[in-house]
Amino acid sequence: MDWKTSEMLFPFPVYMAPLTSKFAAYKKKIANWLTVYRIFIALPTIIFIALDNQLGVLANFSVGAISISLQISLLIGGFLFLTAVISDYLDGYLARKWLAVSNFGKLWDPIADKVIINGVLIALAINGYFHFSLLIVFIVRDLVLDGMRIYAYEKKVVIAANWLGKWKTIMQMVGIVFSCFVWSFKQSEIASLNSGLFFWLLTQLPYYLAAVFSIWSFIVYNIQIYQQLKAYNSKL
């Protein structure tokens, strides 16, 4: 059977070809739109969380004998941040699965992550939801490390992200999500059910673990940058 006969008997792949090519063109756009989504919701997410104490908007209801009061502003901010986390995962997963990594994604994906994560962390720390000293560790680490990466890049030295930095980000995300959803019950009788060690583990431990990974990854990155810059200078 020649290819013409095969095409006449089984025309399905031929008819599907235009659809396949169109879908291939949209692959990069889908991942990029997920990045754009995070950029656009960063500001409203930060505002809802930052104005939690000022707005004080509550939703009151009862479940049996338990009276529940929800901080709506914090809850909305937490929900928006959770959608950002999901979009970040889908963005990376689809880009790898479809081999659809774009220059736009390389530039704006890490920027979107840093803006929304650091912005929300600042808002939470100012409102007293975790210790301000941990925020200083996170911000100083990112600023110094980004400056060193830029300097190394000018010397044609590229330092790839490692698992320590990824776990730092994961712990920050976990801490933010738990803070928003758990602290939204702070004026409720149900908050007493979550008090003590369990309450601390949910709302504080992730930040301390993130601080450990921040310092650890900072040291590792410094060693890698120093070694590669030393190798680069030795070739001059």
From Swiss-Prot:
Any single GO molecular-function term of the entry would be: CDP-diacylglycerol-glycerol-3-phosphate 3-phosphatidyltransferase activity
Q: Classify the source by domain of life.
A: Bacteria
Enzyme class label: transferase
**The keyword Cell membrane is assigned to this record:** yes
Instruction: Give the record's pathway.
Output: Phospholipid metabolism; phosphatidylglycerol biosynthesis; phosphatidylglycerol from CDP-diacylglycerol: step 1/2
UniProt subcellular location: Cell membrane
Gene Ontology terms describing biological process? glycerophospholipid biosynthetic process; phosphatidylglycerol biosynthetic process
Q: What does the record say about its membrane topology?
A: Multi-pass membrane protein
What is known about what this protein does? This protein catalyzes the committed step to the synthesis of the acidic phospholipids.
Q: What is this protein called?
A: CDP-diacylglycerol--glycerol-3-phosphate 3-phosphatidyltransferase
Task: Show the taxonomic lineage.
Answer: Bacteria, Bacillati, Mycoplasmatota, Mycoplasmoidales, Mycoplasmoidaceae
Q: What gene is this protein translated from?
A: pgsA
